[in-house]
Amino acid sequence: MPRPTTSSPSQRMLRVAEQVRHALSETLQRGEIIDPLIENTVVSVSEVRMSPDLRVATAFVSPLGAKDTDAVVEALNKHAKFVRGRVSGALRQMKFMPEFRFKLDTSFDNFARINDLLKSPEVARDLDADDDKTKDDRAKDDKDSE
Protein backbone atom coordinates (compact mmCIF):
# COMPACT_ATOMS: atom_id res chain seq x y z
CA MET A 1 0.00 0.00 0.00
CA PRO A 2 1.58 3.33 -1.03
CA ARG A 3 2.11 6.03 1.55
CA PRO A 4 -0.18 9.02 1.30
CA THR A 5 1.61 12.10 0.06
CA THR A 6 1.33 15.17 2.22
CA SER A 7 1.90 18.70 1.09
CA SER A 8 3.22 19.91 4.43
CA PRO A 9 6.70 18.98 5.66
CA SER A 10 7.06 16.47 8.46
CA GLN A 11 8.31 17.45 11.90
CA ARG A 12 11.65 15.78 11.15
CA MET A 13 12.04 17.70 7.88
CA LEU A 14 11.40 20.97 9.71
CA ARG A 15 13.86 20.14 12.51
CA VAL A 16 16.63 19.12 10.09
CA ALA A 17 15.97 22.16 7.89
CA GLU A 18 16.44 24.46 10.87
CA GLN A 19 19.72 22.74 11.82
CA VAL A 20 20.93 23.06 8.24
CA ARG A 21 19.93 26.74 8.17
CA HIS A 22 21.95 27.47 11.31
CA ALA A 23 25.01 25.60 10.02
CA LEU A 24 24.76 27.29 6.62
CA SER A 25 24.38 30.74 8.18
CA GLU A 26 27.48 30.21 10.31
CA THR A 27 29.49 29.09 7.28
CA LEU A 28 28.44 32.12 5.26
CA GLN A 29 29.04 34.44 8.21
CA ARG A 30 32.61 33.20 8.68
CA GLY A 31 33.35 34.07 5.05
CA GLU A 32 34.83 30.69 4.14
CA ILE A 33 33.75 30.91 0.50
CA ILE A 34 36.45 32.58 -1.56
CA ASP A 35 34.52 34.42 -4.23
CA PRO A 36 34.65 38.21 -4.61
CA LEU A 37 30.92 38.35 -5.27
CA ILE A 38 30.07 36.52 -2.04
CA GLU A 39 32.84 38.05 0.10
CA ASN A 40 31.53 41.59 -0.50
CA THR A 41 27.92 40.68 0.20
CA VAL A 42 26.05 39.86 3.38
CA VAL A 43 23.94 36.80 2.63
CA SER A 44 20.92 36.15 4.82
CA VAL A 45 19.49 32.62 4.88
CA SER A 46 15.79 33.06 5.57
CA GLU A 47 14.58 29.49 5.10
CA VAL A 48 15.79 26.01 4.23
CA ARG A 49 13.42 23.38 2.85
CA MET A 50 14.42 19.74 2.92
CA SER A 51 13.29 17.08 0.48
CA PRO A 52 11.32 14.20 2.06
CA ASP A 53 14.39 11.93 1.89
CA LEU A 54 16.56 14.70 3.46
CA ARG A 55 19.07 14.50 0.60
CA VAL A 56 18.36 17.91 -0.96
CA ALA A 57 18.35 21.20 0.94
CA THR A 58 16.93 24.22 -0.85
CA ALA A 59 18.17 27.39 0.84
CA PHE A 60 16.31 30.64 0.26
CA VAL A 61 18.81 33.48 0.52
CA SER A 62 18.68 37.27 0.41
CA PRO A 63 21.92 38.92 -0.69
CA LEU A 64 21.99 42.25 1.12
CA GLY A 65 23.94 45.08 -0.45
CA ALA A 66 24.45 43.35 -3.79
CA LYS A 67 23.60 45.07 -7.04
CA ASP A 68 23.12 41.80 -8.93
CA THR A 69 21.35 39.37 -6.60
CA ASP A 70 20.99 36.72 -9.30
CA ALA A 71 24.77 36.64 -9.76
CA VAL A 72 25.26 36.07 -6.02
CA VAL A 73 22.78 33.18 -6.02
CA GLU A 74 24.51 31.75 -9.10
CA ALA A 75 27.89 32.01 -7.31
CA LEU A 76 26.47 30.23 -4.27
CA ASN A 77 25.16 27.43 -6.48
CA LYS A 78 28.59 27.21 -8.10
CA HIS A 79 30.19 26.72 -4.66
CA ALA A 80 27.44 24.39 -3.36
CA LYS A 81 29.75 21.36 -3.06
CA PHE A 82 32.29 23.40 -1.09
CA VAL A 83 29.52 24.63 1.21
CA ARG A 84 28.33 21.05 1.63
CA GLY A 85 31.79 20.04 2.85
CA ARG A 86 32.04 22.98 5.26
CA VAL A 87 28.59 22.41 6.74
CA SER A 88 29.18 18.66 7.18
CA GLY A 89 31.11 19.21 10.42
CA ALA A 90 28.11 20.79 12.10
CA LEU A 91 25.74 18.11 10.79
CA ARG A 92 27.65 14.96 11.75
CA GLN A 93 24.51 13.28 13.07
CA MET A 94 23.00 13.06 9.58
CA LYS A 95 23.33 9.81 7.66
CA PHE A 96 23.60 11.63 4.32
CA MET A 97 24.87 15.16 3.80
CA PRO A 98 22.27 17.05 1.75
CA GLU A 99 22.99 18.54 -1.64
CA PHE A 100 22.58 22.32 -1.48
CA ARG A 101 20.54 24.38 -3.90
CA PHE A 102 20.26 28.12 -3.48
CA LYS A 103 17.29 30.21 -4.55
CA LEU A 104 16.58 33.90 -4.26
CA ASP A 105 14.15 34.71 -1.46
CA THR A 106 11.54 37.15 -2.73
CA SER A 107 9.40 37.23 0.42
CA PHE A 108 10.93 40.54 1.55
CA ASP A 109 10.09 42.11 -1.82
CA ASN A 110 6.54 40.75 -1.63
CA PHE A 111 6.16 42.16 1.89
CA ALA A 112 7.37 45.59 0.77
CA ARG A 113 5.02 45.57 -2.23
CA ILE A 114 2.00 44.66 -0.08
CA ASN A 115 2.99 47.24 2.53
CA ASP A 116 3.23 49.96 -0.14
CA LEU A 117 -0.13 48.89 -1.51
CA LEU A 118 -1.78 49.11 1.92
CA LYS A 119 -0.34 52.60 2.44
CA SER A 120 -1.58 53.87 -0.92
CA PRO A 121 -4.19 56.69 -0.77
CA GLU A 122 -6.89 54.60 -2.46
CA VAL A 123 -6.68 51.78 0.09
CA ALA A 124 -6.39 54.21 3.02
CA ARG A 125 -9.56 55.98 1.82
CA ASP A 126 -11.43 52.66 1.60
CA LEU A 127 -10.22 51.59 5.04
CA ASP A 128 -11.33 54.92 6.54
CA ALA A 129 -14.76 54.48 4.94
CA ASP A 130 -15.04 50.99 6.46
CA ASP A 131 -14.04 52.35 9.88
CA ASP A 132 -16.69 55.09 9.66
CA LYS A 133 -19.32 52.54 8.69
CA THR A 134 -18.35 50.31 11.62
CA LYS A 135 -18.57 53.24 14.06
CA ASP A 136 -22.02 54.14 12.71
CA ASP A 137 -23.16 50.53 13.14
CA ARG A 138 -21.93 50.48 16.75
CA ALA A 139 -23.68 53.77 17.53
CA LYS A 140 -26.90 52.42 16.03
CA ASP A 141 -26.61 49.22 18.08
CA ASP A 142 -26.07 51.26 21.25
CA LYS A 143 -29.23 53.30 20.55
CA ASP A 144 -31.24 50.14 19.91
CA SER A 145 -30.15 48.57 23.19
CA GLU A 146 -31.36 51.56 25.27
From Swiss-Prot:
Arranged from A to Z, the UniProt key words for this protein are: Cytoplasm, Ribosome biogenesis
| Subunit structure comment from the entry | Monomer. Binds 30S ribosomal subunits, but not 50S ribosomal subunits or 70S ribosomes.
Q: Which Pfam families match?
A: RBFA (PF02033)
Q: Where is the region Disordered? A: 125-146
Write out the annotated subcellular location: Cytoplasm
In the record, the note on similarity to other proteins reads:
Belongs to the RbfA family.
GO BP annotation list: maturation of SSU-rRNA
Q: NCBIfam families attached here?
A: PRK00521.2-5, rbfA
* GO molecular function list: ribosomal small subunit binding
Record organism: Mesorhizobium japonicum (strain LMG 29417 / CECT 9101 / MAFF 303099)
Q: What does this protein do?
A: One of several proteins that assist in the late maturation steps of the functional core of the 30S ribosomal subunit. Associates with free 30S ribosomal subunits (but not with 30S subunits that are part of 70S ribosomes or polysomes). Required for efficient processing of 16S rRNA. May interact with the 5'-terminal helix region of 16S rRNA.
Query: By what name is this protein known?
Result: Ribosome-binding factor A
Q: What do the Gene Ontology cellular component annotations say?
A: cytosol
